[in-house]
C-alpha cells in the first residue's frame, strides 16, 4: 500500500510528549522514523508511570508507535560520525531538547545545512527566542499557563485551571507536524530545506484565539454578554473564567443525568442555539417560552440563563445520559454524553473507526493506543507497536554501510 510519506526519512531526537507526538504521526503517514536514544537509558518516558515492572511504560509506547529505535552516544567520535551519516541521508530532523542542546553536540543549524542542504529541521521549544521566558523549562502545564489557557479555564470564583487535554504537549506536536509537511512541499519548489520552529506557548495561544477575540471585545465594551457574569456580575480588565459556558455565542452547560449522585460522569453537555430555540422549548416541555418576550431571544434569555438550564436539568436528571442525548438529538439539539476514559476504551465504534487500536509489543504484550485521527480514502495507517530500546540499531547501521565487526567495535567503545 502506498503511503504519503513513503521514502521520507526522519531523525527523531525527541522525548516525552510534544516531539514524539509529531514524529509518531509522520511514521503513521509512512515515513521511516528513526528514534535516536541514549544507550541503556532511552526516552525518559520508557520508565515513567510504569504499570508493569521493567517494561516500557504506556507513556512511551503510546507516543512512539511505528518508529525504529537506535541507541547512539553522540558524545563519542564514532557516534558523531554515525550522526553525520544519518543527517546526510535524512529528509527531516526533529528535536525538542532544551535550547542549545543540539548545538552542543556539534550540529548547529549552519553545520547541518552544510552536511545536507535539503534537510528540514523541526524544533520545539517552550517559548520563542524573543520571549523573556526563553530559558524557562517548559512542560505541558507551563505552556497552558503561559499560552492563555489556564487563565480562561475554570470557574469565576476559583483559581485558574489546566486542561487534562495535552494542549501544551501533543497540540504543539501537531502544530509542528503541519509546519514540517508545509516545508516538505516548499522543498519541492526550492530544492532546499529550512528550519521550522514551534513554541509551546504559541501552540496553546493558537487554540485560545477566541479568548484573544474576547479580550478585544472586553476592552471596547467593558462586558461579554455570553459569559455567565453578564449582566449581574462584574468584569475586570481581562477575559474571565466562564466555567462550562459555551464560548461561541451559543450558551451551553453541563447538566446532571440519572445516577449523578454516584457516577462522576453521569452528565451531558447541552447547547442552546438561537435558530433552534423553538425545538428546544418543545423538547423540554416549555412551548410557552417560544413567544414569551423574556425567553424568545438570546439577549433576553442571558440574564436568567441558569434558570433555563435548571429547568432543562429537571428533565435530564430523570434519565440516563445516553437516553437524554438520544431524545434531544431528535430535536436537533447539540449535546453529548460526558464519556469517561473507561467508556471510551470500550467503545466499539472507536475500535471500528480505528481511533482506538490494539497492538502488541514483544515484552509488554497487547495494549490499547490511539489510532490515526484522520481518515483517508486512499490509505489506512497501519498502527504498529513502539520499538524496544535499540531494537533497530544494527539494521540502521548496516544500511549506512557499517560491517558487523565495525558495529561490534562501536558497541565495545560505548558509541552504541
Swiss-Prot record:
EC number: 2.8.3.16
Catalysed reaction equations from the record: formyl-CoA + oxalate = oxalyl-CoA + formate; formyl-CoA + succinate = succinyl-CoA + formate
Gene3D superfamilies registered for this protein in UniProt: Crotonobetainyl-coa:carnitine coa-transferase, domain 1 (3.40.50.10540), formyl-coa transferase, domain 3 (3.30.1540.10)
Residues that coordinate or bind substrate: 248-250
Effect of deleting the gene: Cells lacking this gene show a reduced acid tolerance response (ATR) during the adaptation phase. However the deletion of YfdW has no effect on survival in oxalate-containing challenge medium.
Record's note on what induces expression: By the acid response regulator EvgA.
Gene Ontology biological process terms, A to Z: cellular response to acidic pH; oxalate catabolic process
Pathway connected to this protein: Metabolic intermediate degradation; oxalate degradation; CO(2) and formate from oxalate: step 1/2
Catalytic residues (positions): 169
SUPFAM superfamilies reported in the protein's UniProt record: CoA-transferase family III (CaiB/BaiF)
Gene Ontology molecular function, alphabetical: formyl-CoA transferase activity
Keyword entries, A-Z: Transferase
Family matches, as InterPro entries: CoA-transferase_III_domain, CoA-Trfase_fam_III, CoA-Trfase_III_dom3_sf, CoA-Trfase_III_dom_1_sf, Formyl_CoA_transfer
Enzyme category, top tier: transferase
Ligand binding (CoA): 17-18, 38, 72-75, 96-98, 104, 137-140, 273-275
NCBIfam families found in the cross-reference section: oxalate_frc, PRK05398.1
Function text: Involved in the catabolism of oxalate and in the adapatation to low pH via the induction of the oxalate-dependent acid tolerance response (ATR). Catalyzes the transfer of the CoA moiety from formyl-CoA to oxalate. It can also use succinate as an acceptor.
Oligomeric and partner information: Homodimer.
Family affiliation: Belongs to the CoA-transferase III family. Frc subfamily.
Protein name (record): Formyl-CoA:oxalate CoA-transferase
Gene responsible for this protein: frc
Amino acid at each position: 500500500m502506498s503511503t504519503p510519506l513513503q521514502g521520507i526519512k526522519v531523525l527523531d531526537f525527541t522525548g516525552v510528549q510534544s516531539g514524539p507526538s509529531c514524529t509518531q504521526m509522520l511514521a503513521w503517514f509512512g515515513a521511516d522514523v528513526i528514534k535516536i536514544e541514549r544507550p541503556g537509558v532511552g526516552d525518559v518516558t520508557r520508565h515513567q508511570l510504569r504499570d508493569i515492572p521493567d517494561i516500557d511504560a504506556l507513556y512511551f509506547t503510546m507516543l512512539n508507535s511505528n518508529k525504529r529505535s537506535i541507541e547512539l552516544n553522540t558524545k563519542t567520535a564514532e557516534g558523531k560520525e554515525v550522526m553525520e551519516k544519518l543527517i546526510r541521508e535524512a529528509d527531516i530532523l526533529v528535536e525538542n531538547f532544551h535550547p542549545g542542546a543540539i548545538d552542543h553536540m556539534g550540529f548547529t543549524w549552519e553545520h547541518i545545512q552544510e552536511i545536507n542542504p535539503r534537510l528540514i529541521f523541526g524544533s520545539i521549544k517552550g517559548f520563542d527566542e524573543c520571549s523573556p521566558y526563553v530559558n524557562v523549562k517548559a512542560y505541558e502545564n507551563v505552556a497552558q499557563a503561559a499560552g492563555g489557557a489556564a487563565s480562561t479555564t475554570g470557574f469565576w470564583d476559583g483559581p485558574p485551571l489546566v486542561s487534562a487535554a495535552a494542549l501544551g504537549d501533543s497540540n504543539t506536536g501537531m502544530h509542528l507536524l503541519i509546519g514540517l509537511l508545509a516545508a516538505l512541499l516548499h522543498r519541492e519548489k526550492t530544492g532546499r530545506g529550512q528550519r521550522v520552529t514551534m513554541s509551546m506557548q504559541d501552540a496553546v495561544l493558537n487554540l485560545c484565539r477566541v479568548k484573544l477575540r474576547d479580550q478585544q471585545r472586553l476592552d471596547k465594551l467593558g462586558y461579554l454578554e455570553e459569559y455567565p457574569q453578564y449582566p449581574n456580575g462584574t468584569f475586570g480588565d481581562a477575559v474571565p473564567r466562564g466555567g462550562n459556558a459555551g464560548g461561541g455565542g451559543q450558551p451551553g452547560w453541563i447538566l446532571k443525568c440519572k445516577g449523578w449522585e454516584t457516577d462522576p460522569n453521569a452528565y451531558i453537555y447541552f447547547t442552546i442555539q438561537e435558530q433552534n430555540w423553538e425545538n428546544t422549548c418543545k423538547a423540554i416541555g416549555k412551548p410557552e417560552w417560544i413567544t414569551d418576550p423574556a425567553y424568545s431571544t438570546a439577549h433576553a434569555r442571558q440574564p436568567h440563563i441558569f434558570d433555563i438550564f435548571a429547568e432543562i436539568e429537571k428533565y435530564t436528571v430523570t434519565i440516563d445520559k445516553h437516553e437524554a442525548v438520544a431524545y434531544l438529538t431528535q430535536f436537533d439539539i447539540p449535546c453529548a454524553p460526558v464519556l469517561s476514559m473507561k467508556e471510551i476504551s470500550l467503545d466499539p465504534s472507536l475500535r471500528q473507526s480505528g481511533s482506538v487500536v490494539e497492538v502488541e509489543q514483544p515484552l509488554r504484550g497487547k495494549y490499547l493506543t490511539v489510532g490515526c485521527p484522520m481518515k483517508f480514502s486512499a490509505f489506512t495507517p497501519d498502527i504498529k507497536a513502539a520499538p524496544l530500546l535499540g531494537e533497530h540499531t544494527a539494521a540502521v547501521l548496516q544500511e549506512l554501510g557499517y560491517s558487523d565487526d565495525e558495529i561490534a567495535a562501536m558497541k565495545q567503545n560505548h558509541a552504541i
